[in-house]
């Protein structure tokens, strides 16, 4: 059953100048309720200046979400500037159907495309497929403004190091020139 529970923040990691990732501790009695499938999301609830705010964020890995500061974003500003380890937020149990079956016996080729903070569900899916489907390959095309704005850069590099023949990563940057023109610009239909 989908419900809110108070969870404690146990880690806040600065991913870029504009984004943090937040890791929650789940009490043993709630572990089954917070098991998630790659691609699902959490809804966070808190009160800021007397106003109840709810925001949904895709689960990256573990029970971690990424929050990127957006203009006029009350919750995103709060999470990036004021949220601290030890704080408690109301967190709804995982939800969402942006998932796919895991088939360890099959050899699949996944093409994943993400831009900016849209990497969060994709990262979770890529990690799972690479780990659980030993014959499968993942190619990720990931668009960002600049190298400094790439969320989860260390995690992505870790996947390249762990699965060098099965994980291909292509960075497309819109505001930082690259040597190969193909890797400049935005990801779009063209």
PLM regions with names:
Residues 2-88, 92, 144-146, 157, ...:
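Ferredoxin-reductase
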Residues 77-190:
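FNR/FR-type flavoprotein reductase catalytic core
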